[in-house]
Amino acid sequence: MNKILISLFFPLAIGHAQQADTPLNVILMIGDGMGLSQISAGMYTNNNQTVLEDFPVIGLSKTHSINNLVTDSAAAGTAMACGEKTYNYVLGINSDNKKLESVLEICEENGYNTGLIANSSIVHATPASFYANIDSRKKYEEIAVQLSESNIDYFIGGGKKHFN
């Protein structure tokens, strides 16, 4: 099972009107395919504790795609990144075949710095759901082109072979 870590960095350079307790960055970490069973297994092997318990905010996401009760990473990632359901295998496109805007793109439009980090290919479905609009998660080279044309400030991940 691949676990994907996605980080969204949003430095808030708003100025003096900013409250002192406003965070400088927001980091969203997604354990792709990770559920309660995987968390429990981690707890059982580590004296019934995980570092997740130390995080100030954690959450779970229960999703299903438009066409299936069992979602895939593309549809789940699109739902998380864009706030709208789509079909399995589809990234950043809704049921009306319209391109969706992700939270990362909205932050870019508002002057925030953004980044993605993946411990798998950076063009895999979950990280790609934050920048790609394409009808198949398997079109890796086209997804790589969309990443290279994006305004993402920083990205790290595998998948060099897809950037021709």
Stretch-by-stretch model annotation:
Residues 4-13:
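Sec-dependent N-terminal signal peptides
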